């Protein structure tokens, strides 16, 4: 092989080209590649964090739904218990009112019965006195009649 000046010039030119590329072209290219790699790595990490956050949010949402269902069930159970309690209280009050009304009615009935008996006794006594008066054909004065009526009424 023959080494001449052209080959030597080409080697020097190539070396200068490589040095120029290494000094001025290569660092910005490497920096751009590194920035791009960093952005991709950050994007992947962000995607992983987002996936973890999504899983965590879904787990929290599921827990909150379970808690809300449990709370709703408790509220419904308390409402049903309160409803039963109110119904029982209303039944008890109605039963007490019923007993009160029945007792009042019985008392009124007994009072009316006693009034009717007294009235009947007075009428019987008056009839007895009138009959006795007719039998005796004489008039009894009012005081004597009242004494006789009271006496007969007490015996009846």
Swiss-Prot record:
Transmembrane segments: 7-29
Record carries keyword Transport: yes
Aminoacyl-tRNA synthetase recorded as keyword: no
CDD domains: ATP-synt_Fo_b
Subcellular location: Cell inner membrane
A Pfam family that the UniProt record links to this protein: ATP-synt_B
A GO term for molecular function: proton-transporting ATPase activity, rotational mechanism
Keyword field: ATP synthesis, Cell inner membrane, Cell membrane, CF(0), Hydrogen ion transport, Ion transport, Membrane, Transmembrane, Transmembrane helix, Transport
GO cellular component term of the entry, any: proton-transporting ATP synthase complex
Membrane topology summary: Single-pass membrane protein
Assembly, per entry: F-type ATPases have 2 components, F(1) - the catalytic core - and F(0) - the membrane proton channel. F(1) has five subunits: alpha(3), beta(3), gamma(1), delta(1), epsilon(1). F(0) has three main subunits: a(1), b(2) and c(10-14). The alpha and beta chains form an alternating ring which encloses part of the gamma chain. F(1) is attached to F(0) by a central stalk formed by the gamma and epsilon chains, while a peripheral stalk is formed by the delta and b chains.
Entry-linked HAMAP family: ATP_synth_b_bprime
Protein family according to the UniProt entry: Belongs to the ATPase B chain family.
Function: F(1)F(0) ATP synthase produces ATP from ADP in the presence of a proton or sodium gradient. F-type ATPases consist of two structural domains, F(1) containing the extramembraneous catalytic core and F(0) containing the membrane proton channel, linked together by a central stalk and a peripheral stalk. During catalysis, ATP synthesis in the catalytic domain of F(1) is coupled via a rotary mechanism of the central stalk subunits to proton translocation.
Protein name: ATP synthase subunit b 1
Top-level taxonomy: Bacteria, Pseudomonadati, Pseudomonadota, Gammaproteobacteria, Vibrionales
């Amino acid at each position: 092989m023959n080494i001449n000046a052209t080959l030597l010039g080409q080697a020097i030119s190539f070396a200068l080209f490589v040095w120029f590329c290494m000094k001025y072209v290569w660092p910005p290219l490497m920096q751009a590649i590194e920035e791009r790699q960093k952005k991709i790595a950050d994007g992947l990490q962000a995607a992983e964090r987002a996936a973890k956050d999504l899983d965590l949010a879904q787990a929290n949402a599921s827990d909150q739904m379970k808690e809300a269902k449990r709370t709703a069930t408790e509220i419904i159970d308390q409402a049903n218990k309160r409803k039963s309690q109110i119904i029982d209280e209303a039944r008890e009050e109605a039963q007490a009112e019923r007993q009160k009304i029945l007792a009042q009615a019985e008392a009124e009935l007994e009072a009316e019965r006693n009034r009717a008996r007294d009235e009947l006794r007075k009428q019987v006594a008056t009839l007895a006195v009138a009959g006795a008066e007719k039998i005796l054909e004489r008039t009894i004065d009012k005081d004597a009649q009242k004494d006789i009526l009271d006496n007969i009424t007490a015996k009846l």
